[in-house]
């Protein structure tokens, strides 16, 4: 046996590799409590980034640095950190991993959504005991276009099952998987059950055993499996897994088949080199045809180095990543083997996405950006293509959690931060920034297409909870407005509505915890003297029938005709094919439709004094202000409606200020809404897609409570046991050739015989706010609830009076 101690970089090394192929932009995603932050902490220690391992429960991890994160033991906001890792199987040069640790709680799903927009790959962490949970499936859907590797964590826990989890993964995600390593258990004198202490490396046919008592990820013993007795169980399982791997790769990769039969291996799966296997797995992973699966126990420091190797081996560099989505769609985006994405055939065009905005008490405003093409230099003039505004940026930094490292420039594939007073109020989350890669003021050399360019648009989920925000005194009103502006700029999934009639300010968010964190920040971090109402469900209204068309026309040249109607965003393509342009108004799926807009842009050079961008922004502002409290049932915001501007619109060519344009269009929208009475308005409420896991003996009680007390609609009832006979055939077709190693501990784990069933139900959110405690009572603590926002639904007539009374 050999003693192997993982080589680690010194924490003082600050110089990063500059070639693009050496970067890995990856995210850590998982269901809450699967071990994301713990895994990240071990990665940083193994890489020499930190000298001491922090602990989530102790509140001293690197990436969970906010006070509320450390108090609650959960990740609230995404944290970015860069570090080097040397994969011993490749050349001697280190790779740079730009890692983003994301939240797992459903209330902070927007943090995950915006992070996924800038990542080239992801590590999906699975709880080896819980398996593939509801939030895991949701994260898989969000990241379906991103190459991933899976890490089955917590294999040291009683009831953990690697193959059980692997079966769930292949069944629930419909993705082909390949086992790169799997758990190794050893019988000890201290325990009746086998103890997890290492992994079996299928690629290199090695057994890696960690000394778990040493409490260090570095103390690893390496055993050559081929030197063991043929009857040794570890060797037998490894050979079966390698044969399975070769069959899977042979089915998906023709080049591998040729190398397998014509190369040195001569058709023997044990003779295929690690290099050939890794090359094929990498190719298929980047093509999103295969997902490598690894095992470990992060808290016990087991399996971290192979996971880091897997990130380098299998996940793409920016040169290999999928091309960004660009609008307008006629702007060409091609792959350049040297620089990655080349946008609009412009070698010197730097394109960056601002995916996160935050305020630091010391550094001020910080804008996190991902560079897609070109080079962004400190001190350069840039343009925000959303607003059309040009401004000079200050210092550029790379973040190491809450520590900043200043750099002179950011290259393609890098994730960095804009800082300085010059960017204040200039950039919001989701904005695209363009610049010239060489000239400081070269932005002037770009044309109209570049100035309209948008990259990887970020969709903001609609908020479903709200809370009233009131100043403690009238003198504090401006302070509160500024604080709310700051907090919503950082987190656009928070939304502020001000009722112009009552003056009431309402803060909307994704969940109760989401709003609790926002309240904490306003009071404790921003020191705003404010009172809050009770957190409540956010209701909306919509139109049943379109309003009448109303018109404004005068001798000065103003001519606008418009109406308001219910609208489904799925019909946007139909509108655009007819020559109209559709613009999102807000987070409530409201839209502005400008008929004939595309023809206007094509047939003329836009002779108006007011720029195109300002014209659209003005009409959008009118729509937003008019719709936010226009409902007649409960004076609520309108949802899923469209303001349709008829194609004969016009205004004076020499009009320079948009103020009159704003006033006219806003009055018109209000007038249009007055043409229909209250009977044309419908009250809407958020409904949730609930996944409720309950013991079989409690199904009847729980379903009766859901249908009667919660007015839920039951969609289906599923068996959580993937191995049940009715699922075996489907699982077999999805996991063809995949070998499932023996789950050594499941036979001895103290698991109750009462199998769990999953109830899928559509439920009004209002009826589910306190349901978790009720479910625990009905199931003696064994029931589990997970909910996803499904959409807005009409409120039944019998429930409307109670809801209006609550409002």
Swiss-Prot record:
The keyword Nucleotide-binding applies. GTP binds at residues 30-37, 101-105, 153-156. GO terms for molecular function: GTP binding; GTPase activity. GO terms for cellular component: mitochondrion. The keyword GTP-binding applies. One of its GO terms (biological process) is regulation of mitochondrial membrane potential. Its main location: mitochondrion. Keywords: GTP-binding, Mitochondrion, Nucleotide-binding, Protein biosynthesis. It comes from the Eukaryota. Residues 21-319 form the tr-type G domain. Disulfide bonds: none annotated. It is found in: Mitochondrion. This protein may be expected to contain an N-terminal transit peptide but none has been predicted. Belongs to the TRAFAC class translation factor GTPase superfamily. Classic translation factor GTPase family. EF-G/EF-2 subfamily. Mitochondrial GTPase that mediates the disassembly of ribosomes from messenger RNA at the termination of mitochondrial protein biosynthesis. Not involved in the GTP-dependent ribosomal translocation step during translation elongation. NCBIfam families: small_GTP. This is Ribosome-releasing factor 2, mitochondrial. It comes from Candida glabrata (strain ATCC 2001 / BCRC 20586 / JCM 3761 / NBRC 0622 / NRRL Y-65 / CBS 138) (Yeast). The gene is MEF2.
């Amino acid at each position: 046996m050999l003693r192997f101690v993982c080589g680690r970089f010194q924490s003082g090394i600050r110089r990063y590799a500059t070639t693009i192929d050496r970067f890995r932009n990856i995210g850590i995603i998982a269901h809450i409590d699967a071990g994301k932050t713990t895994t990240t902490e071990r990665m940083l220690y193994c890489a020499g980034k930190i000298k001491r391992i922090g602990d989530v429960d102790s509140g001293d991890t690197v990436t969970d640095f906010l006070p509320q994160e450390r108090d609650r033991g959960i990740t609230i906001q995404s944290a970015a950190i860069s570090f080097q890792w040397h994969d011993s199987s490749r050349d001697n040069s280190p790779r740079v991993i730009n890692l983003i640790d994301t939240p797992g709680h459903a209330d902070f799903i927007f943090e995950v959504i915006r992070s996924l927009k800038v990542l080239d790959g992801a590590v999906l962490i699975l709880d080896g005991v819980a398996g593939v949970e509801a939030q895991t499936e949701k994260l898989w859907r969000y990241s379906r276009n991103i190459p991933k590797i899976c890490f089955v964590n917590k294999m040291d826990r009683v009831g953990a099952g690697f193959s059980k989890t692997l079966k769930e993964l292949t069944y629930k995600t419909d993705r082909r998987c390949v086992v790169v390593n799997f758990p190794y258990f050893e019988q000890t004198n201290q325990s009746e059950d086998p103890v997890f202490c290492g992994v079996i490396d299928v690629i290199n046919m090695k057994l890696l055993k960690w000394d778990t008592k040493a409490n260090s990820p570095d103390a690893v013993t390496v055993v050559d499996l081929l030197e063991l007795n043929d009857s040794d169980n570890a060797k037998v399982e490894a050979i079966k897994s390698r044969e399975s791997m070769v069959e899977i790769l042979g089915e998906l990769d023709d080049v591998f088949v040729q190398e397998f039969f014509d190369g040195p291996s001569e058709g023997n799966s044990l003779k295929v080199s690690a290099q050939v296997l890794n090359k094929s797995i990498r190719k298929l992973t980047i093509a999103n045809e295969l997902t490598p699966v690894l095992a470990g126990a992060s808290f016990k420091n087991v399996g971290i180095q192979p996971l880091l190797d897997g990130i380098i081996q299998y996940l793409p560099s920016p040169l290999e990543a999928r091309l960004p989505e660009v609008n307008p769609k006629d702007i060409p985006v091609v792959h350049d083997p040297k620089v990655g994405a080349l946008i609009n055939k412009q070698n010197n065009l730097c394109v960056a996405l601002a995916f996160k905005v935050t305020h630091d008490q010391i550094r001020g405003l910080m804008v996190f950006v991902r560079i897609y093409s070109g080079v962004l230099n400190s001190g350069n003039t840039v343009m925000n293509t959303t607003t059309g505004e040009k401004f000079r940026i200050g210092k550029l930094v790379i973040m190491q959690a809450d520590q900043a490292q200043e750099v002179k420039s950011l290259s393609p594939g890098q994730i960095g931060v804009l800082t300085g007073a010059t960017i204040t109020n200039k950039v919001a989350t989701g904005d695209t920034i363009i610049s010239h890669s060489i000239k400081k003021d070269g932005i002037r050399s770009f044309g109209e297409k570049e100035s309209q360019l948008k990259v990887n648009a970020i969709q903001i989920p609609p908020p479903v909870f709200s809370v009233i925000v009131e100043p403690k005194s009238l003198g504090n009103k401006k302070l509160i407005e500024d604080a709310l502006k700051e907090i919503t700029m950082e987190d656009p999934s928070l939304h502020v509505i001000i009722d112009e009639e009552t003056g009431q300010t309402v803060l909307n968010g994704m969940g109760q915890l989401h709003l609790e964190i926002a309240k904490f920040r306003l009071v404790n971090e921003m020191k705003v003297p404010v009172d809050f109402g009770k957190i409540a469900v956010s209701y909306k209204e919509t139109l049943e029938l379109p309003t009448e068309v109303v018109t404004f026309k005068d001798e000065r040249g103003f001519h606008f005709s418009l109406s308001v109607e219910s609208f489904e965003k799925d019909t946007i393509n139909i509108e655009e094919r007819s020559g109209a342009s559709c613009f999102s108004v807000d987070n409530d799926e409201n839209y502005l439709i400008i008929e004939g807009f595309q023809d206007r842009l094509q047939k003329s050079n836009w002779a108006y004094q007011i720029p195109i961008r300002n014209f659209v922004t003005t009409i959008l502002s009118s729509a937003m202000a008019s719709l936010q409290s226009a409902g007649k049932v409960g004076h609520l915001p309108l949802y899923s409606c469209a303001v349709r501007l008829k194609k004969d619109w016009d205004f004076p060519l020499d009009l320079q200020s948009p103020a009159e344009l704003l006033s006219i269009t806003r009055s018109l929208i209000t007038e249009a809404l007055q043409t229909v009475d209250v009977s044309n308005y419908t009250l809407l409420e958020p409904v949730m897609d609930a996944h409720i896991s309950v013991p079989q003996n409690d199904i009847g009680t729980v379903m009766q409570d859901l249908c009667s007390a919660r007015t839920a609609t039951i969609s289906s009832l599923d068996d959580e046991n993937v191995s049940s006979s009715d699922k075996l055939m489907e699982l077999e077709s999805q996991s063809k050739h995949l070998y499932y190693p023996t789950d050594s501990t499941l036979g001895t784990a103290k698991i109750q015989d009462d199998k769990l069933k999953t109830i899928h139900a559509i439920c009004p959110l209002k009826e589910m706010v306190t349901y978790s405690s009720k479910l625990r009572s009905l199931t003696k603590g064994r029931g589990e609830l997970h909910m996803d926002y499904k959409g807005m639904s009409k409120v039944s007539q019998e429930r409307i009076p109670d809801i209006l009374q609550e409002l």
